């Protein structure tokens, strides 16, 4: 009845795992008890869990990302500590099979459940506001996409205490991921957590692509869109094209494991290298799915805090489009050692070098925007400058790795690990932190504490270079990635420095937690009463903070790129107008319902509980059919309510002397 699931699936003989899992359960019980005690379940259900408001969904994406960041960071600390101990002549505290699960989970968590939610959360907040829309094109899909990501994260977390996770690395190359070499449920957990969250991401891509193409304010042609919206458009094009490749690849691997197919096996016509090609045809665009939105963040931040028009708007747009196209013809640089031949390697090496050109164009545009500007060193600008330094180093090491002979030496070494983290942390994570500090008032109506924000930045930047610069040297010294036992003692000193860097990053995360706490505590002091605390240039700053549920009482008409900026110079951006009732989408619990049964389907597929798989899949299909015929999906915001909200905003702006 329960397939392969038995009590033996609980790893009671692994004290570290059991203590961790029991701690997670106790924390979950404490949170549930607190919500019950304060009678907040009804509030959470109606205001948050069932919401289709893109702004609230962006907040929930951020919460998911920070929860999973904590889990992923703990994994990183465990790995660093194990390597330090193992390089000092001891065996360490993590057995090899547990260490292998940790480094696999770390990669999956940080890419799929930290970086992606951060990026999608920012797009959820900013895109509709920047294009003058009241919501996304498909509000229900937005809610469903979020909860599918949550289901994927929960399924991955379940593997910690029920069964095991994959020991294959975050991309699960066959034949190691085939059932012959990984007969346990770890790879199945990996497949279904990625499959469920990947479907949610694909729906997000479709949703935002349609939103940007069809819901822009009147007069906003493509070359009047803000650069962040351009970056979001290209990002979602990449999502819509590349994520179906991931879904298909995982499906083929599932057929190999469950039904004895031979797509990626070493025999009966299978081809493991086909898997590697397919996974990286998704994987390298995924890098730019993460990076392009934060390029948009930096464009907005630099222009705002330099008090200047963005330098080279058109070249920035074309550079973004060039990166979007080139990202699909560089994937083979991840495996030059495959043996495809010198001509193939040369082609992909050259395209990899070429993609550095539009990236360089962007960096120079940001520098020229700052040049002779009245630069205000807000914490968002600090994250931006940190990015410029860190990402440039990551880019240079990437160009070095694009040379096939060099890659043959450095492939699978810690040099590669350092390069990858240079790009992802220095680019994506720093960019998301810049965006959070920048747009936080638009979500919550008050400004984040600057003192603790700057402390967080300095611990992060110093910790990052302390943690990852030694890895470049270790790579040159010949240390390969994913080692946990019998590490050469000559690596001990540099590994110890890297571990100190990880601790400094941990202090940076603690500073961010304190920043949020202090900001909430002092929110009445740091209120954003005007909706435009930074003297911004784009449409989102024309609304109150927090932005009203309908975003815009009257859809704006756009005349130029920096329309709001021009209106402010004319001193007439806010005035009393005639309003009409607005139709807005209703909240729905169907998204969380479908995602729960998707989670059940994934769990039952992992453990071969066939009856539960069929039942949960059937419930998902019936729910989607029910949603497709439901016509009661909207409610009306009255003119009286709109006037109340807008007049209050007008009064605040007039008091601030901005009329």
Swiss-Prot record:
Annotated positions binding a ubiquinone: 71, 75, 98
Sequence position, cross-link 1'-histidyl-3'-tyrosine (His-Tyr)? 284-288
Which parts of the sequence lie on the Extracellular side of the lipid bilayer?
1-14, 80-106, 167-189, 247-277, 331-347, 402-413, 478-490, 602-605
- Biological process (GO), any one: aerobic respiration
- Side of membrane Cytoplasmic, spans: 36-58, 128-145, 211-225, 299-309, 369-380, 435-456, 512-580, 627-659
Residues that bind heme b, according to the entry?
106, 170, 421, 481-482
Does the entry feature the keyword Iron, yes or no? yes
* Details of cofactor binding: Binds 1 copper B ion per subunit.
**Which reactions does this protein catalyse?**
2 a ubiquinol + O2 + n H(+)(in) = 2 a ubiquinone + 2 H2O + n H(+)(out)
Q: Which InterPro entries match?
A: Cyt_c_oxase-like_su1_dom, Cyt_c_oxase-like_su1_sf, Cyt_C_Oxase_1, Cyt_c_Oxase_su1_BS, Cyt_c_ubiqinol_oxidase_su1
Q: Which PROSITE patterns match?
A: COX1, COX1_CUB
Grouped into one coarse class, the protein's main location is: membrane
**Record: residues binding Fe(II)-heme o:** 288, 411, 419
Q: What class of enzyme is it?
A: translocase
Per the entry, which co-factors are needed?
Cu(2+); heme b; Fe(II)-heme o
Query: Does the keyword Iron feature in the UniProt annotation?
Result: yes
Query: What is known about its subunit structure?
Result: The cytochrome bo(3) ubiquinol oxidase complex is a heterooctamer of two A chains, two B chains, two C chains and two D chains.
Q: Which protein family is named in the record?
A: Belongs to the heme-copper respiratory oxidase family.
Name of the protein described by the UniProt record:
Cytochrome bo(3) ubiquinol oxidase subunit 1
């Amino acid at each position: 009845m329960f397939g392969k699931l038995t009590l033996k699936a609980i790893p009671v003989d692994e004290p570290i795992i059991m203590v961790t899992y029991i701690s997670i359960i106790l924390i979950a019980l404490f949170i549930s008890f607190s919500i019950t005690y304060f009678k907040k379940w009804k509030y959470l259900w109606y205001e948050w869990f069932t919401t289709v408001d893109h702004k609230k969904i962006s907040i929930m994406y951020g919460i998911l990302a920070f929860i999973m960041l904590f889990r992923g960071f703990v994994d990183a600390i465990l790995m660093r500590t194990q390597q330090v101990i193992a390089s000092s002549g001891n065996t360490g505290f993590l057995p090899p099979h547990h260490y292998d699960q940790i480094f696999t989970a770390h990669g999956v968590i940080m890419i799929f459940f930290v970086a992606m939610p951060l990026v999608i959360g920012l797009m959820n907040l900013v895109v509709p506001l920047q294009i003058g829309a009241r919501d996304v094109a498909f509000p229900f899909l937005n809610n469903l996409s979020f909860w599918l990501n949550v289901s994927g994260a929960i399924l991955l977390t379940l593997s910690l205490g029920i069964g095991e996770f994959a020991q294959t690395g975050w991309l699960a190359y066959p034949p190691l991921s085939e059932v012959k070499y990984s007969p346990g449920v770890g790879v199945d957990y990996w497949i279904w957590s990625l499959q469920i969250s990947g479907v949610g991401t694909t729906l997000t891509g479709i949703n935002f692509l349609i939103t940007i193409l069809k819901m822009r304010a009147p007069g906003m042609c493509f070359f009047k869109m803000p650069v962040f919206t351009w970056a979001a458009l290209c990002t979602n094009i990449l999502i819509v094209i590349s994520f179906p490749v991931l879904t298909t690849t995982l499906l083929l691997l599932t057929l190999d494991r469950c039904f004895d197919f031979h797509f990626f096996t070493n025999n009966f016509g299978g081809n493991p290298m086909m898997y590697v090609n397919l996974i990286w045809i998704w994987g390298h665009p995924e890098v730019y799915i993460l990076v392009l939105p934060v390029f948009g963040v930096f464009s907005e931040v630099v222009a705002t805090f330099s008090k200047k028009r963005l330098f080279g708007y058109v070249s920035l747009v074309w550079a973004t489009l060039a990166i979007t196209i080139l990202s699909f013809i560089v994937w083979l640089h991840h495996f030059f050692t495959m043996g495809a031949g010198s001509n193939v390697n040369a082609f992909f090496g050259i395209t990899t070098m070429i993609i550095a050109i539009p990236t360089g164009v962007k960096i120079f545009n940001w520098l020229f925007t700052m040049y002779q500007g009245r630069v205000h060193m807000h914490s968002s600008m600090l994250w931006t400058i940190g990015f410029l330094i860190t990402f440039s180093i990551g880019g240079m090491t990437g160009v070095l790795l694009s040379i096939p002979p060099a890659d043959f030496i450095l492939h699978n070494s810690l040099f590669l690990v350092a390069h990858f983290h240079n790009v992802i942390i220095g680019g994506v994570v720093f960019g998301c932190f810049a965006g959070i500090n920048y747009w936080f008032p638009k979500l919550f109506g008050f400004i984040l504490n600057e003192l603790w924000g700057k402390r967080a930045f300095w611990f992060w930047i110093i910790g990052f270079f302390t943690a990852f610069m030694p890895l470049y040297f270790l790579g040159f010294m010949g240390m390969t990635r994913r080692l946990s036992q019998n590490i050469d003692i000559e690596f001990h000193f540099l590994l110890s420095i890297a571990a100190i860097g990880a601790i400094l990053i941990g202090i940076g995360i603690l500073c961010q937690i304190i920043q949020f706490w202090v900001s909430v505590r002092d929110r009445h002091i740091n209120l954003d009463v005007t909706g435009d605390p930074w003297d911004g240039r784009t449409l989102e700053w024309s609304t109150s903070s927090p932005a009203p549920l309908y975003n815009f009482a009257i859809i704006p008409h756009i005349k130029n790129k920096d329309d709001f900026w021009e209106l402010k110079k004319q001193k007439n951006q806010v005035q009393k107008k005639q309003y009409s009732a607005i139709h807005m989408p209703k909240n729905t619990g169907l998204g969380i319902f479908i995602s729960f049964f998707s989670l059940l389907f994934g769990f039952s597929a992992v453990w071969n509980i066939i009856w539960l798989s069929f039942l949960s899949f059937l419930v998902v299909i019936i729910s989607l059919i029910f949603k497709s015929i439901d016509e009661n999906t909207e409610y009306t915001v009255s003119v009286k309510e709109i006037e109340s909200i807008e007049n209050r905003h007008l009064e605040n702006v007039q008091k601030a002397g901005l009329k």
